[in-house]
């Protein structure tokens, strides 16, 4: 599995994101650059200029028309993907750490930082998916996180809930329409921040990554923990693969703790776990520094990782990845194949 190395950033990556079709990959970093790449060959399509601070987060709407980014310059910006044109800027009192479009693209949530006397908030903006439409200045909803600030957040299926991960290791479920807090459950170790939250394809469950060295698979409906994936290093990111029942975790010793660590000791690897059986399957090495963000291609053919070293690596899975099965899975597949043949012959 030879990686394609994308060198378009001068500083650490903060987030990478595939569009819904899986043909474009967007990357943002602390160097104030947004890059977009063709996912199949790593060719750079272009960059989006305008932010005046480190860019923490990126998301793309379901139709691949509009791009949203959140930055340390205290703004959320909307861009036209095709031309790179800046469509709208919303200003906030503090940095924006996470943005995410709802399933239909009609709403955008933003997570703002707790700083300088301002409490952390989750804001919701109404979005028109027409590049020529006038976007509203008003926030449709603001949720104030009074206990522990939200570090990540996202929309569940049908925009029914807003799910947020917090600095104290808890996960909250808010009503997607009025912002009421429905649940707040301690999921990870106390005061070990949740660093990432990524959705399954149908948004009925999600995966978290945390500094407590674990990743958890959780239902959106009632925040029940389905699976736990233990690692031996603090985790920065986790994602769920399509086609195969795997999850990919990324992390490593924190950048500020790294002195003269070898890449092996620093544990700068992408880890593959079986989604159902919770056991580690393998690791992919390559980054020289912690993995800050991982993303799985929605078509299930590849995955990408972004590191503290400023590189994005796209890995296209080879045949062995798709053929790999546990014995129990293989037996089940053989049974299904036999049943199909019997029904055909009958």
From Swiss-Prot:
GO cellular component: eukaryotic 43S preinitiation complex; eukaryotic 48S preinitiation complex; eukaryotic translation initiation factor 3 complex, eIF3e; eukaryotic translation initiation factor 3 complex, eIF3m; nuclear periphery
MF terms in GO: RNA binding; translation initiation factor activity
Subcellular location: Cytoplasm
GO biological process: cytoplasmic translational initiation; formation of cytoplasmic translation initiation complex
UniProt cross-references to InterPro entries, sorted A to Z: eIF3i, WD40/YVTN_repeat-like_dom_sf, WD40_repeat_CS, WD40_repeat_dom_sf, WD40_rpt
Domain of life, source organism: Eukaryota
Disulfide partners: none
Quaternary structure annotation from Swiss-Prot or TrEMBL: Component of the eukaryotic translation initiation factor 3 (eIF-3) complex.
Family note: Belongs to the eIF-3 subunit I family.
Identification of the protein by name: Eukaryotic translation initiation factor 3 subunit I
